[in-house]
Amino acid sequence: MTIFLVVLVTFGVILEFLSLRNNFTNIKYRCTPTKLGCEPGEVFQIVSTFTNYGYRTIPFLKVREVFPGGLHIQGVENESDQQRNFLYTSVLYIRRRQKITRTIQASLPHRGRYLLEGCTILGGDFLGIREKLEEIKQQEEIIIFPMLLESEYIQQALSGYYGDFSVRRFYSEDPILVSSYRDYTGREPMRSISWMQSARKNHLMVKEFDYTMDLSVTILMDVYLHWSEGAHTEELEYCFSLARTIAEFMEQKRVSYRLLTNAYIGDLNKVSESVSEAGQGSHHFTTLLFTLGQATSNTFGSVDDLYDMVVQKYSGENAIFYLAPFENEKRSSLVDHLQQRLNSQVYPMYAAAILGGVKDAD
């Protein structure tokens, strides 16, 4: 009996010594979302993988994963603060050379860029006297797109604007877009006469202009707020949703569009000119969604800087949709100056006013 106890104690001391030497260097962790981008409230999966590359079984491994604030995990009543990360705790028994994969269903209710930043693992010694802690860092992200605004009030407004600028293009003739020539009837203005073609034909010929050119618009999103104007969080978020809604409307009408904004995209040190080239199609639209999802309400320029950007990058768009949280003297002046400077129709859309109109319509 004494020999058995000595052997048992010796064996326990050896296991305790080995467990104390375990510093988790053989434990690898990876956590990834199954989608790069989602709609607000859309369910996606978070896949966590734990791999033990060592030759020792770890009977007790407590894992605290760092998830973004606002994350809702299906089946778990978590009231997480939108602004703070929260810890999702689980306990594992992991054998040597074993990989454990766990999948959870989750969703995020608000637009933004969310990070899965790693985990903290805690393991105990063999006798359960001590705990060891190690932090594993990573940075996987998921982008939540701005919400699509499906209000009839907004759709009617966009339809009216579309009808307006699509008709206006017929009022001005572009001398570059000549599709063909025809005989002069006497009703055409003198500037329509092609003297070169007339000389070839020995009678007057006039130019016919091509009006089937692609329409193009600029979505100009201004999120600049002076510190004295307050936060206006709801109105700012509404601007992002308006930009997404306009882009989707233009996709349906097969109108090329681009986005210009003074908002920071992603990290505060990353200034973006957004989707600054006009285009359309699924790839262009998806790029715009990710841009809007990552954008913050922090700005790199004032209203005046935004005006300079638009004038510099103007390329003959038929219309400019100017989006801002609310109207003020500075913004009204910007709209007037753009209207006078550029050969485009400028449509101001102020979130505060539209929110009021939507509520009244409902």
Q: Where on the chain are the PLM-derived regions?
A:
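Generic structural signal for short, solvent-exposed loop/turn connectors between secondary structure elements
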Residues: M1, L158-S159, S166, A353-D362
